[in-house]
Amino acid sequence: MSLTMADGVEAAAGRSKRQNSLLRKQLALAVRSVQWSYAIFWSSSLTQPGVLEWGEGCYNGDMKKRKKSYESHYKYGLQKSKELRKLYLSMLEGDSGTTVSTTHDNLNDDDDNCHSTSMMLSPDDLSDEEWYYLVSMSYVFSPSQCLPGRASATGETIWLCNAQYAENKLFSRSLLARSASIQTVVCFPYLGGVIELGVTELISEDHNLLRNIKSCLMEISAHQDNDDEKKMEIKISEEKHQLPLGISDEDLHYKRTISTVLNYSADRSGKNDKNIRHRQPNIVTSEPGSSFLRWKQCEQQVSGFVQKKKSQNVLRKILHDVPLMHTKRMFPSQNSGLNQDDPSDRRKENEKFSVLRTMVPTVNEVDKESILNNTIKYLQELEARVEELESCMGSVNFVERQRKTTENLNDSVLIEETSGNYDDSTKIDDNSGETEQVTVFRDKTHLRVKLKETEVVIEVRCSYRDYIVADIMETLSNLHMDAFSVRSHTLNKFLTLNLKAKFRGAAVASVGMIKRELRRVIGDLF
């Protein structure tokens, strides 16, 4: 009896392996026949009835060439699909620096011990399409959810164009498809599950194309079924000869079913034990060595929410990290400072600091830290001056101070003897005793600045000196202004200047700043 059970388990294991191998070949042949990017078989979950999860897949996209090229693209596609699956399971275990040892050989699916050449597959080596294919492995779909769920519930084929722009309710991987340039996705029911195919091109619905895909799937399935039936008949006849008396066909069917379940559960627990615990947090094994799981009916809805949340977390991490991998940049946690990666942002920042340096008169340093420190000090000084002025507004001291300031301005006059603009006064000549008329020219220095949007009107009246107009023009240029109208004249060594200018660029100086810079040029008379 023990020999019979062992033979049943071995037979079930062989059937499971052949079925997976057959399904991979079917998907590979179908996706290669139409030259699409990938094919996925979403199978029914054994732990959650009605839920679709990853069953098998075949990647046929533009794979990145690593160290060598391969003659058979078909066989290389099968091997690449296995490598991506292994990489996903390794990443799911929590190893952020995952590298998977891969093998490339004659790719005989029935014999895994053939001679091979070992290579290392890292997440850094994946293209956008390969990332799309890998992240899709983490998705599960409840009944009528997204394309696979709807195709399974309705039993109809769903053809989606412009998948990268589809709503999240219809196609939850639309954002991921946009980064991978996946434009067309097709889903149709098959063997109790759903087959999904995708391509980076925009292809309208074509019934002939669907018939071609389904015929490729059925062609391999028909040949394999004939071989399986012959092998099954031989195996059953052998088992019947080994059965002891008193065991019926129903007992044999029961034992064969149990063997199949045990083999499938053991296979999944050995390979994807951590994956199952991660994806099904509400399912707990009855004991460490058991192949069965217990579940609670009330926790199924919560489990669905956790599945969706986990998929979104994986998608968010991929979308955030993959662009940094391809551009060979450091991760944000390793960067220090602001705007180190973008030259345009750094240039704009330097321009703003240059404008800030010109606006603060006491700043002569070049480094940004000194500019900011001096700017803070200057603002504190201005704040103190404003508080002082507000405190003395309306007081007697303020009125007296204002009167003295006016007197000081009136004392800044230019007295010159001339034939016009004079006051009647007398000057006594000590030698002759005669009196003569003297012209006293009185006027005060005047400065007026009027700002309207980007145009500035400046009126200056002050004592004349050499190159004073050139100095004024240079000051305006340092303030990022260009003069377009200048009128000036000099009378009795007194300059009158009317000037109009416009600002260059977006930086606009204040009226107070313009007056302060012009006062330096005019001199102490103001």
UniProtKB/Swiss-Prot annotation:
Region annotated Disordered, chain positions: 330-351
Inducers of expression: By cold, UV, flagellin, jasmonic acid (JA), and salicylic acid (SA) treatments.
Entry comment describing in which tissues the protein is expressed: Mostly expressed in developing seeds. Also detected in stems and leaves.
Primary role: Trancsription activator, when associated with MYB75/PAP1 or MYB90/PAP2.
InterPro entries: bHLH-TF_ACT-like_plant, bHLH_dom, HLH_DNA-bd_sf, MYC/MYB_N, MYC1-like_bHLH
Alphabetical UniProt keywords: Activator, DNA-binding, Nucleus, Transcription, Transcription regulation
A GO biological-process term: regulation of primary metabolic process
UniProt biased composition (Polar residues): 332-341
PANTHER family to which the protein is assigned, alphabetical: TRANSCRIPTION FACTOR MYC1 (PTHR46266:SF1), TRANSCRIPTION FACTOR TT8 (PTHR46266)
GO cellular component: a single term: nucleus
Keyword field contains Transcription regulation: yes
Protein name, per record: Transcription factor MYC1
Species of provenance: Arabidopsis thaliana (Mouse-ear cress)
Subunit composition and interactions: Homodimer. Interacts with MYB75/PAP1, MYB90/PAP2, MYB4, MYB5, MYB6, MYB23, MYB82, MYB113, MYB114, TT2, MYB0/GL1, and MYB66/WER.
A Pfam family: bHLH-TF_ACT-like_plant
Chain ranges of the bHLH domain: 333-382
Subcellular location, record wording: Nucleus
A GO term for molecular function: DNA binding
Gene: BHLH12
UniProt keyword Transcription regulation present: yes
Location, primary (coarse class): nucleus
